[in-house]
């Protein structure tokens, strides 16, 4: 990734707000983001859809009427695909939908997704979740101070289990551990909130791709 820009990212701390300079992609490639999201969803797909062929349906294989002299069309058994309840031709069978995507593309996609939130002013870094000890009401009080009122969906990334536990009951918050940060969850939510430890994990993951 050749084009890099310096983003000023707000950092929220108990003593107030400051800014952190970060090198992230200057240009966002929507198609690359789509490729990564498509790869993620394909990996999650169960692929259990299954239809029965004419050899698997629960019907006798007996010919339903003689070939000639009935005045009717020629048919074999009643399990043929032409009959209601018969087998399915070329229907889905259980399969694995996952495929490989180059690690470099995945790194670029993650860096671009975070950069897009930074460019929109929707990325917030947090030094400490003061007063949050596992209770939802504690997180709501902190969120109000941070300017998060539930009007926008939030992806909260932190290694602090107590903070994740406090926020997970809220319908407008998606919580992830730092290692679980991914493009799909970033693009499906409107704001990205990370603590500084999660930010460091992210920087190590993209490893120069910005």
From Swiss-Prot:
Keywords: Ribonucleoprotein, Ribosomal protein, RNA-binding, rRNA-binding. GO terms for cellular component: ribonucleoprotein complex; ribosome. GO terms for molecular function: rRNA binding; structural constituent of ribosome. Transmembrane segments: none annotated. It holds the Pfam family Ribosomal_L4. The N-terminus is blocked. SUPFAM superfamilies: Ribosomal protein L4. GO terms for biological process: translation. Changing residue 55 to A: Increases Ptase activity of hybrid ribosomes to a value greater than that of pure E.coli ribosomes. Increases binding of a tRNA analog to the P site. It comes from the Bacteria. Disulfide bonds: none annotated. Belongs to the universal ribosomal protein uL4 family. One of the primary rRNA binding proteins, this protein initially binds near the 5'-end of the 23S rRNA. It is important during the early stages of 50S assembly. It makes multiple contacts with different domains of the 23S rRNA in the assembled 50S subunit and ribosome. Part of the 50S ribosomal subunit. This is Large ribosomal subunit protein uL4.
């Amino acid at each position: 990734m050749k084009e890099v820009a310096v983003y000023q990212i707000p950092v929220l701390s108990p003593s107030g707000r400051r800014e952190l300079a970060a090198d992230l992609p200057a240009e966002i490639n929507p198609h690359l983001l789509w490729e990564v999201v498509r790869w993620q969803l394909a990996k999650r797909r169960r692929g259990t859809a299954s239809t029965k062929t004419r050899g698997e349906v629960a019907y006798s294989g007996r010919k339903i009427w003689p070939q000639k002299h009935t005045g009717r069309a020629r048919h074999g058994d009643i399990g043929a695909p032409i009959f209601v309840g018969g087998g399915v031709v070329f229907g889905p069978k259980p399969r694995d939908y996952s495929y490989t995507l180059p690690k470099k593309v995945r790194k670029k996609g993650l860096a671009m997704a975070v950069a897009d939130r930074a460019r929109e002013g929707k990325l917030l870094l947090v030094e400490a979740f003061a007063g949050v000890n596992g209770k939802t009401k504690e997180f709501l009080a902190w969120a109000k101070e941070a300017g998060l009122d539930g009007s926008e969906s939030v992806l909260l990334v932190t290694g602090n289990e107590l903070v994740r536990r406090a926020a997970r009951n809220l319908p407008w918050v998606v919580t992830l551990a730092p290692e679980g940060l991914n493009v799909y969850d970033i693009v499906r939510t409107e704001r990205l909130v990370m603590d500084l430890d999660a930010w460091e994990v992210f920087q190590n993951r993209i490893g120069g791709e910005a």
